Curated annotation (Swiss-Prot):
GO terms for molecular function: pectate lyase activity; pectin lyase activity. Belongs to the polysaccharide lyase 1 family. This is Probable pectin lyase F. Residues 1-16 form the signal peptide. InterPro entries: Pec_lyase, Pectin_lyas_fold, Pectin_lyase_fold/virulence, PEL. Its main location: secreted. Keywords: Carbohydrate metabolism, Cell wall biogenesis/degradation, Disulfide bond, Glycoprotein, Lyase, Polysaccharide degradation, Secreted, Signal. Disulfide bonds join 77-101, 326-334. Glycans are attached at residue 124. It is an enzyme of class 4 (lyase). The gene is pelF. It catalyses: Eliminative cleavage of (1->4)-alpha-D-galacturonan methyl ester to give oligosaccharides with 4-deoxy-6-O-methyl-alpha-D-galact-4-enuronosyl groups at their non-reducing ends. Its EC number is 4.2.2.10.
């Protein structure tokens, strides 16, 4: 019996550990490094391992369900006419968990407490799903307070009070650095799939993830989740590569703010935006955004009009000339972005983006032809595909 158990553990360790290594801005991130991979045996042990200061490779080999573990709250939530009532909408709306309700009315609500407080991930951690079994249900992950060198790979984070705005965030970065978020799936979240700020997120690679916005409760009243990615950190460098964002309706992503000293460089490459009922990119001030090889299919607004006026610097690579003009500063020809059945994609070629990107040349990832994006991304993004 002991021999069988030992064989199973050894097989598990061999099968599930970090696959590959990050490219782009999170290059060099090692997470738990050479620590022996191990699967926790209880929720308490899972939380302890994630939050302590010991380097670890934590295997998620089952569904860890936090719903109900910290009780529920029954009280009043705010119902807003435009996001909750949804007259004429195709889905239910989202009520708001908050202490004010200007312009709305109070309604009775009941929500789960566990989702409101994410697990704080310690430094030098790899949190890795086994096959397609790794699920964290009802609670998110947060890297903050100077913690760094974290890998989150092959995990499905789901069911954080999806019927309520402010119901919970899946992944939070706040005063962090060296974070690789790879081959995960995020679905049915109350607030943001990924959020950064107000402190720095640091050097981050977000690659090969599936952002699944299908929901029965939508602030856009259209069955598509609105709160996708909100990037507001003080000094942030993002590689956003090979991700599949589908059936969402906003902040996909939003980046930048004038409320802090936020400074963001964002390199978006070979991502697939599919069936977006609202906007994809929404760019504010103090940002430098290089976009190439992204495919927008059935996206109502690939780039908001506000993005063109808010002061952010954009290189949208929408023409052959714009693609070729990358060569002088970056040393390669950029890949153009492609639209199918989508709204307008504005041509912006701010030289400041190329100048800044040239200083990060070693962190710029390569691209493949944009025509290949839908098939390759769908085949590769999400859990069970590492």
């Amino acid at each position: 019996m002991k021999t069988a158990v030992l064989s199973l553990l050894l097989a598990l360790q061999a099968y599930a550990r970090v696959t590959g290594s990050p490219s782009g801005f999170a290059a060099g991130t090692t997470g738990g490094g050479s620590a022996t991979p191990a699967a926790p045996s209880s929720l308490d042990e899972l939380v302890q391992w994630i939050t302590d200061d010991t380097p670890r490779v934590i295997l998620i080999d089952r569904t860890w369900d936090f719903i109900g573990t910290e009780g529920t709250t029954t009280g009043k939530c705010c119902s807003m006419p435009s996001t909750t009532v949804c007259n004429g909408g195709t889905s239910k709306g989202q009520a708001w968990i908050q202490d004010h309700c200007d312009g709305g009315s109070w309604v009775s609500c009941k929500y789960d407490n566990a989702a409101l407080t994410p697990m704080d991930v310690g430094s030098n951690k790899s949190i890795v799903g086994v096959g397609n079994k790794g699920v964290i249900k009802g609670k998110g992950l947060r890297v903050r307070n100077g913690n760094k060198n974290v890998i989150i790979q092959n995990i499905h984070i789901t069911n954080l009070n999806p019927q309520y705005v402010w119901g919970g965030d899946a992944i939070t970065l706040d005063n962090a650095d060296q974070v690789w978020i790879d081959h995960n799936k995020i679905s049915l979240i109350g607030r943001q799939f990924i959020v950064s700020g107000w402190g720095k997120a640091g050097h981050v690679t977000i690659s090969n993830n599936e952002f699944d916005g299908r929901t029965s409760w939508s602030a856009g009243c259209n069955g598509k989740h609105y709160w996708t990615l909100l990037l507001l950190g003080e000094q942030d460098y993002y590689t956003f590569e090979g991700n599949w964002l589908h059936d969402v309706s906003g902040r996909a992503p939003h980046m930048g703010t004038d409320h802090t000293k936020s400074q963001i460089f964002f390199h978006g490459v070979n991502n697939y935006f599919q069936n977006l009922g609202g906007h994809a990119f929404d760019v504010d001030t103090n940002t430098w955004v290089l976009l190439e090889g992204n495919y927008f299919e059935n996206v109502k607004t690939p780039l908001t009009d506000t993005s063109l006026k808010a002061g952010g610097k954009l290189y949208t690579t929408s023409t052959v000339n714009a693609a070729g003009a990358c060569l002088d500063k970056l040393g390669y020809i950029c890949e153009w972005n492609r639209l199918a059945g989508s709204g307008a994609w504005q041509d912006r070629t701010d030289a400041d983006v190329k100048t800044k990107a040239a200083t990060y040349k070693n962190s710029l990832v390569g691209h493949y032809p944009v025509a290949d994006v839908p098939a390759k991304v769908v085949a590769n993004a999400g859990v069970g595909k590492v």
